[in-house]
Regions:
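Short solvent-exposed beta->alpha transition segments
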Residues: 28-29, 44-90
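Alpha/beta-hydrolase active-site loop
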Residues: 225-247
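Catalytic active-site module of serine/aspartate enzymes centered on a nucleophile-bearing elbow/loop
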Residues: 404-407, 412-444
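Accessory cap/linker subdomain of secreted extracellular hydrolases
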Residues: 278-362, 392
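N-terminal cap/lid segment of alpha/beta-hydrolase-fold proteins
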Residues: 127-165
Length: 444
């Protein structure tokens, strides 16, 4: 499954809330009907179930493009094994555990009170999380905190070492999509791994629910004006400000760790914020987003052998996205279709105007750049952007990790989306390097 595509769907299929009138069993039955229609490629029937916002965001052609791209990666939907539902913000969210030909995936559908589909996306199946062996739960405690101000306050968790402080601190910033505070992907929780592992080494860690996860309903109406400032940057800086007011946090030793999109944006978060003592970039991209999407789609298509006619529509759609993404005529109010998923022009134009490597080069704070050598999403080409821009900086450390994928967990051979479905943990070597680097950054 194309994880970039899944994250985009999760990011853009945002929900709104009204009181439900149907019962849980009704919504589960509706969800199974939708799954059956998708499996049968009855796209017109699926589209007829959409609410007005969903119908506008994913019309028939885009729905077909999305589902065909899914089938190209994981095969046809074979069976629905189980269904579970939960009410959230007045909507009913139904998760169907599905078996596709090549991999299990959960189909998650969101219904309004009238049974209309307000959003849907595919996610890896969940499994129980167990602590990594480098975490020592007796060495720390956790406290629930609130980040930011109304109307966008976010729940977070402060993982704090036991003992006499003050301690250095790290803020964790997630990648694309509406992530929870653990940046959960299936049974993997890389941010929980980092929080527990670093706190076991004497470092305070703050992680929090992403705004587009907590306030999905509100942001459905705000998507046309959404940029990474609202999605990521404002809340990361609010988290830094919260730590600055905590007596157990050592002054001038608060760091920002960003992963994926968070890594790409880490220099922008730090620029102009003198409370940030340094940044850690994990799998942060430096190249244009459209270029990365094309490269990724071609790679995923190649996993099944020589690229045949079946993959050409998906590759063509990716290339069309890259062309539209870079279009000089793109203006506010427009949308760009990414494999059937509409991205608002405000979001695209904001990303286009940002050069992560050049921004990093303007910083004088210490930086740690980490890259998995088996990452097919953010690759060696992106790392070269950091290396070139930061070549003259003596306070920059760059490390790569053989055999690790985008989540800094072991990758398969060849690396594939299936790697994210296997329960694992952020590699000990990566955790050790982060902890040692933070410990080495002393106040002037």
């Amino acid at each position: 499954m194309n994880r970039l595509q899944v994250l985009a769907v999760a990011s853009l299929a945002l929900l709104s809330g009204l009181a439900p009138q149907l019962c849980a069993q009704d919504f589960e039955a509706l969800a199974k009907d939708v799954a059956q229609e998708l499996a049968g490629r009855q796209y017109d029937k699926v589209e007829a179930r959409f609410d007005a916002t969903m119908a506008s965001a994913m019309p028939l052609e885009k729905l077909q493009t999305f589902w065909d791209a899914t089938a190209a990666q994981v095969g046809a939907l074979k069976t629905v094994k189980s269904a579970r539902s939960v009410e959230t913000q007045g909507y009913h969210v139904v998760t169907l555990a599905c078996d596709f030909e090549k991999a299990p995936l959960n189909l998650r559908l969101v219904f309004d009170k009238d049974g209309k589909v307000a959003g849907f996306f595919l996610v890896p199946p969940e499994a129980a999380w167990n602590p990594p062996d480098y975490a020592n739960p007796s060495a720390f405690h956790e406290e629930h905190v609130t980040i930011g101000a109304e109307p966008w306050q976010l729940p977070g968790t402060l993982t704090e070492p036991i003992g006499a402080g003050p301690f250095p601190a790290v803020v964790l910033v997630q990648g694309s999509g509406p992530n929870d505070e653990d940046e959960s992907v299936g049974s993997n929780k890389p941010f929980k791994d980092l929080a527990w592992g670093l706190a076991s080494r004497g470092i305070i860690v703050l992680r929090y629910e992403k705004r587009t996860h907590k306030y999905a309903a509100q942001y459905k109406k705000e998507m046309g004006n959404l940029t990474v400032k609202e999605e990521v940057i404002d809340d990361a800086r609010a988290a830094v400000a919260l730590l600055a007011g905590r007596p157990e946090v050592q002054k001038a030793r608060t760091f920002v760790l960003g992963h994926s999109l968070g890594g790409m944006l880490a220099p922008r978060i730090a620029e102009g914020d003198n409370q940030i003592a340094g940044i850690i970039i994990m799998a942060g991209s430096t190249r244009p987003f459209g270029q990365i999407v094309v490269e990724q789609i071609k790679y995923l298509a190649s996993l099944s052998g020589p690229v045949g006619d079946g993959a050409k529509p998906q590759i063509g759609a990716a290339e069309k996205f890259a062309q539209d993404y870079d279009s000089p005529s793109l203006k506010l109010g427009d949308t760009v279709s990414m494999m059937g998923i509409p991205l608002p022009a405000a979001y695209v134009l904001d990303l286009r105007s940002y050069d992560p490597a050049a921004t990093a080069a303007r910083l004088t704070i210490p930086m740690l750049v980490l890259q998995g050598e088996s990452d097919y999403q953010v690759t060696r080409k992106d790392l070269e952007g950091w290396e070139k821009a930061l070549a003259g900086h003596k306070n920059v450390t760059i490390k790569t990790y053989p055999g690790l994928c985008h989540l800094f967990i072991p990758a398969g051979n060849p690396p594939s989306p299936a790697d994210y479905d296997k329960p694992s943990h952020v590699a000990r070597g990566t955790l050790d390097d982060i902890a040692n680097w933070v410990a080495a950054q002393r106040t002037p």
